[in-house]
Amino acid sequence: MLTKSFIEFLYDAAHIQRWNEHIRPSGFTELDKQAHKMMIMYVLARHEEDDHGAQLNWRLLIEGGIFEFLQRNVLTDIKPQIFHEMMRVYGKELNAWVYQELRRRIPDIQEDFMEKMQLYFEYPQYCAMEKKILRAAHYLATKWEFELIYHFNEGIYGSEDTKAVIENELEDHYDLAAVKKLALKGKSSKFIDLVGQLRFQKRWAQSPRVPETSVMGHVLLVAIMGYFCAVKLGACDERIVGDFLCGLFHDLPEVLTRDIISPVKRSVPGLDELIKRMEERMVAEKILPLLPYTWHEDILYYTQDEFSNRVRIDGKVVHTSIEEISSKYNKPGFHAIDGSVLKGCDNLSAFVEVWLSRRYGITSKHMEEGERAIREQYKNKIIGGIDFGRVYDEFPIID
């Protein structure tokens, strides 16, 4: 499903403005909200496993998040209170229309994916705990946004009702371990605040673009593309989850250093390595202390050498090839990550950001050079069985 129609549909979420009936600062897009939600989901799920011994299906957590993202991308112009009431009364009919719209707007969408999506939405007891965690993550991401705009809207009709609705929904999720912890504004809450700042770091900051995208939205798109690549490679569930989470967290250090563009990193010999060492030190000092110690190894695994093909054997990181991962390590216990495929998704995301803006007639020298260089780099290129060259060929050259 790594096709032009699907990728363009994902980027539609970068156009959708949230809270547009409220006084608000800029930067609240549906894409960013969905990315923040998935990072919060990770925190909730890990705490639920650690504190309550929950047996969670991480692949279903990720797929559920993708299903809900696609659904909201079709329906999100509907005001939240109206949306939830419509789903309560006409949920089956609305979802049937969503499936129809997805098939119309993404002609090459895979039928087995659609069948899983229908199962997810039409059977309430299917993966009930995973749905509960995603629902809590949704309201926590919404609450994070609303707290930022609340003081702009105090006294405006309806703002107190909105606040009460969000708080009541979260109260219904207090049986989840992390929801209580987050309400106390402890370390986990500070982590969610910190990663939330990725919403405000703009990509291609030196150039005007439409749509504007943030580092936060970018990482979710890389994660989703990484998920579909892993499925195409026939990856086991653990490998699929690893590729998604690595895509989701690969730019986490940039919340501390900001998005240092590749030409700057390459401008001085050794500068790229220096930046990496600085990022590692700052992650250790600023991010890891906000998370339980038992999570540190995984966070470092997702953020260090993020684009290397690797597995973990007896607690040690071993660098390898995608071919060897597929033949020897495509099973639980090795925590395989297809780093070079994720690098391909990362570059594809950068390319599409520029291509979309130039299609709308907004361009710059930086964007023209960037689009040309990335397209040339991936001409006829296949990575681990993923034909990235074919994907680029679907995007026509803009003169």
What is the predicted role of each segment?
Residues 1-399:
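Alpha-helical, largely C-terminal catalytic domains
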